[in-house]
Amino acid sequence: MEKLFIAAGLFVGLVCLVKCMRFSQHLFLRFCKALPSSFLRSMGQWAVITGAGDGIGKAYSFELARHGLNVVLISRTLEKLQTIAEEIERTTGSCVKIVQADFTREDIYDHIKEHLEGLEIGILVNNVGMLPSFFPSHFLSTSGESQNLIHCNITSVVKMTQLVLKHMESRRKGLILNISSGAALRPWPLYSLYSASKAFVYTFSKALSVEYRDKGIIIQVLTPYSISTPMTKYLNNKMTKTADEFVKESLKYVTIGAESCGCLAHEIIAIILNRIPSRIFYSSTAQRFLLTRYSDYLKRNISNR
């Protein structure tokens, strides 16, 4: 029995050490060492960003163009894409291609493939995603768009990765950033379908990272918490980053490993949340809090925007 306790203690200590090392890496890269633009450019001439019309996707489009890459913007609303493309070309001098596609549909990928033919794609950002309901709610109370969410949050990641990864493999270099969520790190009741879809992105990305790391391809999953975007409607503060703030910081960590929260503030949030015992996190009291006070907080955010 004594040996069992010693082994358990050593295991817990090892886990804590790994987490401390990961946090220290983020801390060092956040304040001491910036990733040179030449690294991102060395991946290839073009970056492809899904969900580029708003929020995080739009921010990645501008930031990667500022780093010297040409960008392919893929999203549903043509007018938004045209406006963003014009501004990127005017402010950065990078070339921009736009592809109108609705990721809630399955029949779009041949169309996307045609627009990507012949491009040296070095970076793919699988960002597009949707919430079934903005407010926390029980599964049967959501609007019934479950299939749309599966296509948008899961199918898009698989299909876009298939389109781009084989060319990266032949060139033996590339970077794929899959935007998951902190809600992927443990099941989140009242956001059950969204949490499950992001958990797929998390596990899929981690497995792919192992499969292709020896072929010169970096595959990293990002698990942010609160980001102020048109989809989330959060107000930004010290812990809630704007899309621009999050993207600029996240690009510092692309060489850190297969997983990152994307910013130092969210690494801290993850450490705190992961210390909450399941019996508390999944208690009736916690669920009532989400349904009442957290919903009220979200409503205040909307009214104050």
UniProtKB/Swiss-Prot annotation:
The active site is at residue 194. NADP(+) binds at residues 44-73. Pathway: Hormone biosynthesis; testosterone biosynthesis; Steroid metabolism. Its main location: endoplasmic reticulum. GO terms for molecular function: estradiol 17-beta-dehydrogenase [NAD(P)+] activity; testosterone 17-beta-dehydrogenase (NADP+) activity; testosterone dehydrogenase [NAD(P)+] activity. It comes from the Eukaryota. Substrate binds at residue 181. It catalyses: a 17beta-hydroxy steroid + NADP(+) = a 17-oxo steroid + NADPH + H(+); testosterone + NADP(+) = androst-4-ene-3,17-dione + NADPH + H(+); 17beta-estradiol + NADP(+) = estrone + NADPH + H(+); 3beta-hydroxyandrost-5-en-17-one + NADPH + H(+) = androst-5-en-3beta,17beta-diol + NADP(+). Disruption phenotype: Null males have increased circulating luteinizing hormone (LH) levels. Null males present mild hypogonadism at adulthood represented by lowered weight of testes and several other androgen-sensitive tissues, a shortened anogenital distance, delayed puberty, and subfertility (fewer litters). No phenotypic alterations in the null female. GO terms for cellular component: endoplasmic reticulum; endoplasmic reticulum membrane. Expressed in the testes. Its EC number is 1.1.1.62, 1.1.1.64. Keywords: Endoplasmic reticulum, Lipid biosynthesis, Lipid metabolism, NADP, Oxidoreductase, Steroid biosynthesis. One of its GO terms (biological process) is androgen biosynthetic process. It is found in: Endoplasmic reticulum. Catalyzes the conversion of 17-oxosteroids to 17beta-hydroxysteroids. Favors the reduction of androstenedione to testosterone. Testosterone is the key androgen driving male development and function. Uses NADPH while the two other EDH17B enzymes use NADH. Belongs to the short-chain dehydrogenases/reductases (SDR) family. 17-beta-HSD 3 subfamily. PANTHER family: 17-BETA-HYDROXYSTEROID DEHYDROGENASE TYPE 3, RH59310P. This is 17-beta-hydroxysteroid dehydrogenase type 3. The lineage of its organism: Eukaryota, Metazoa, Chordata, Craniata, Vertebrata.
